[in-house]
A protein has these predicted regions:
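Short His-centered aromatic/hydrophobic patch
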Residues: 87-93, 116
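A short, active-site helix/loop in glycosyltransferases that binds the activated sugar's phosphate group
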Residues: 146-175, 180-182
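A conserved mid-protein helix/loop that constitutes part of the nucleotide-sugar donor-binding site
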Residues: 21-26, 204, 208-227, 243-250
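Short hydrophobic beta-strand element within catalytic cores of glycosyltransferases
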Residues: 302-306
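Nucleotide-sugar donor phosphate/pyrophosphate-binding loop at the beta->alpha transition
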Residues: 68-71, 111, 121-144, 160
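Aromatic "clamp/platform" in nucleotide-sugar-dependent glycosyltransferases that forms part
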Residues: 266, 285
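Conserved acidic donor-binding segment of nucleotide-sugar-dependent glycosyltransferases
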Residues: 317-330, 338-344
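N-terminal strand-loop element at the rim of the active site
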Residues: 5, 10-18, 22-68, 243
Length: 374
């Protein structure tokens, strides 16, 4: 029987512009620098963050069409025979497992790992008003998670939720923190930011970042900021793009703060913005392990976050490194932001919160989970 090589393949054909993509690019470089041949399988096109991919990583472009991606992945497994194929996003999990099964005889033992970065039971389809719809999705998840060789989660809360929802044994789930602090972090942090709102002497800036989607609840952040602006000279910047843009801009206008709110769109490097912000605010209704929170802390920037399932509480150590507030509560958010602005924690204290979120620690954890290191 043909044996698999020591090659690691990161599988992300649904690549977009989120935090998962940044983390996987960093991990690929970490594996390659640790001496493991590493492939990065993704879709065609001009994609963000790929300029950060380590030159030692082999970038493999899959076709754009989903059916063609399946056939190309099967062919890849048959010819390259990686030891590990890790699916990085839930959209790609079934494709990875089906390709492994179709290529099994020739792949010679490739093992598929699924990486879960979201709190599954909080998704709208899992809490649908139609109980049959929720049961259907739970049944599908249980079938899906009966198939991988291993599962990796980004937080304890995500792992606990996944085990309960799918029946996958909690003891078999590896929890590995995201590699937020990776190669080039300091250089990206030091990049200049030519923006008058962040110039010395300008009013303090409240910062949010993420896709402009309903799940992020940036409308709550705008409402809280508007209340604060009645008595304080402040500005609000929300980085990201999405279908909620028009609604958020209209809300800022209706609250009379349109000239003090900006939505610059997608930004490839958020660190210079975070470094100069007075406070970073996470307003989401659900997160797995929000990279923006760990990035802000790494910059020494105070954080306010919703106590949503499941990452903020773990990162902020139950509120020790930043206030945790109820989801959707603009008044509580207003009070928390005011408290942080009046008495911010020292930067060194905030930075100490993310000691586990480094590329070397993450790589070591993944290699242990893959059975490649002790």
């Amino acid at each position: 029987m043909t044996t698999a090589t020591g090659r690691i393949a990161l599988f992300i054909p649904s690549f977009s512009d989120g935090g998962v993509e940044k983390q996987m690019v960093a991990l690929a470089g970490g594996f390659a620098q640790a001496g493991y041949p590493t492939d990065f399988l993704t879709r065609p096109g001009e994609l963000p963050y790929l300029d950060r991919l380590d030159p030692a990583v082999q970038l493999i472009r899959l076709p754009a069409a989903r059916n063609a991606q399946r056939e190309a992945t099967i062919d890849y497994l048959r010819t390259q025979r990686p030891l590990v194929l890790m699916s990085a996003k839930g959209k790609d999990d079934l494709l990875a497992l089906d390709a492994r099964d179709a290529a099994k005889n020739a792949a010679g033992g490739t093992r598929v790992f699924l990486r879960c970065g979201i709190h599954l039971s909080s998704r709208p389809k899992m809490v649908s008003r139609n109980p049959l719809r929720g049961l259907w999705h739970r049944w599908r998840l249980r079938r899906l998670y009966a198939r991988p060789d291993g599962v990796i989660c980004v937080s304890d809360g995500v792992a606990d939720d996944l085990a309960q929802l799918t029946g996958f044994a909690r003891a078999r789930i590896a929890v590995i923190r995201n590699p937020t602090i990776s190669a080039g972090f300091d250089a990206r942090l030091a990049e200049p930011l030519d923006d008058p709102w962040f110039a010395p002497g300008a009013p303090p800036v409240i910062l949010g970042a993420g896709s402009l989607a309903p799940v992020k609840h940036f409308e709550v952040l705008i409402e809280a900021a508007a209340a604060l602006m009645r008595t304080r000279e402040l500005r609000l910047v929300i980085l990201g793009e999405g279908k909620e843009r028009a609604r958020l801009e209209a809300l800022a206008g209706s609250l009379g703060i349109r000239d003090r709110v900006r939505l610059p769109g997608f930004v490839g490097n958020v660190l210079p913005w975070m470094r100069r912000a007075a406070v970073f605010v996470l307003s989401s209704e659900r997160e797995g392990s929000p990279n923006v929170v760990t990035e802000a802390l790494a910059c020494g920037t105070p954080v306010v976050a919703t106590d949503c399932p499941s990452g903020p509480r773990e990162i902020l150590d139950g509120g020790r490194f930043g206030p945790l507030i109820p989801i959707g509560d603009a008044a509580a958010m207003q009070r928390a932001i005011a408290a942080v602005l009046d008495a911010p924690l020292p930067a060194a204290t905030l930075q100490s919160a993310i000691a586990e979120y480094t590329l070397p620690r993450a790589c070591a954890g993944y290699l242990r989970a893959f059975g490649l290191a002790g």
